[in-house]
Amino acid sequence: MAASLWMGDLEPYMDENFISRAFATMGETVMSVKIIRNRLTGIPAGYCFVEFADLATAEKCLHKINGKPLPGATPAKRFKLNYATYGKQPDNSPEYSLFVGDLTPDVDDGMLYEFFVKVYPSCRGGKVVLDPTGVSKGYGFVKFTDELEQKRALTECQGAVGLGCKPVRLSVAIPKASRVKPVEYSQMYSYSYNQYYQQYQNYYAQWGYDQNTGSYSYSYPQYGYTQSTMQTYEEVGDDALEDPAPQLDVTEANKEFMEQSEELYDALMDCHWQPLDTVSSEIPAMM
């Protein structure tokens, strides 16, 4: 049974022939390519659907070339692929993820996925985080559908070798609420890992590392596709993220507290009778 992948971040000049040739250059054969266009203007919406002979072929292609340089693209771009459901309900089954650190630059999405899936069949995918120039930041994420396998991987693969040139560093990745606006196309499983807490400057804390729990924060946005309206993808910027642990200025907080306390004290004292001069002083008459 044929299966399709969603492909995004396309330039207007990238037509069906261009997409087919790009996959062929990577050693992949596609059945067909459907460029999605705006119904009113006819202008390409920036994404397409690529059909393969079967689900296994599509899945293999996804893990093999997703994130790799797109042949012939000017300016330089990378394959941005995902599963496509064409309006069907996305898979809402639980997912359990791990943060994978200390990755060397040679590790890509496919290598990360293959390293785990060969031992843990429930591994759903892997993603190496890249900087704007396409260079690995040295860490990534892997997702599982089986929590027990996620926990096994955390224990059994901690410090393991064989993925790049360094032992891997693992930690549980804890999801945070997604703030992605709804868009008009869908992926069954999202591999967009670009939304993280960014409140500090150092390596771990910059990506949501909790030194108390030894965990990282991430978010997997979900999308929905409908045939009625075509709309391009909107990236969520850093302004949509929250600092989960803002710094507290203790000195300023104490100053504000004391000022409020003094105002309250003065108000309470002003509402009392003034003290008498002596014990024998006459009590003032009521006004």
Swiss-Prot record:
Cellular component, GO, one term: cytoplasm
Cellular compartments annotated: Nucleus; Cytoplasm
Entry annotated with the keyword Cytoplasm: yes
Domain RRM intervals: 3-86, 96-175
Matches recorded under Pfam families: RRM_1, Trnau1ap
One MF term in the entry's GO annotations: RNA binding
GO biological process annotation, one example: selenocysteine incorporation
Main subcellular location of this protein, as a coarse class: nucleus
Entries under InterPro entries matching the protein: Nucleotide-bd_a/b_plait_sf, RBD_domain_sf, RRM_dom, SECp43_RRM2, TSAP1, TSAP1_C
Keyword Nucleotide-binding in record: no
Keywords per UniProt: Cytoplasm, Nucleus, Protein biosynthesis, Repeat, RNA-binding
Subunit and interaction comment: Found in a complex with tRNA(Sec). Interacts with SEPSECS. Component of the tRNA(Sec) complex composed at least of EEFSEC, SECISBP2, SEPHS1, SEPSECS, TRNAU1AP and tRNA(Sec). Associates with mRNP and/or polysomes.
Family: Belongs to the RRM TRSPAP family.
Function text: Involved in the early steps of selenocysteine biosynthesis and tRNA(Sec) charging to the later steps resulting in the cotranslational incorporation of selenocysteine into selenoproteins. Stabilizes the SECISBP2, EEFSEC and tRNA(Sec) complex. May be involved in the methylation of tRNA(Sec). Enhances efficiency of selenoproteins synthesis.
Protein name (database record): tRNA selenocysteine 1-associated protein 1
The species this protein was found in: Mus musculus
Name of the gene encoding the protein in the UniProt record: Trnau1ap
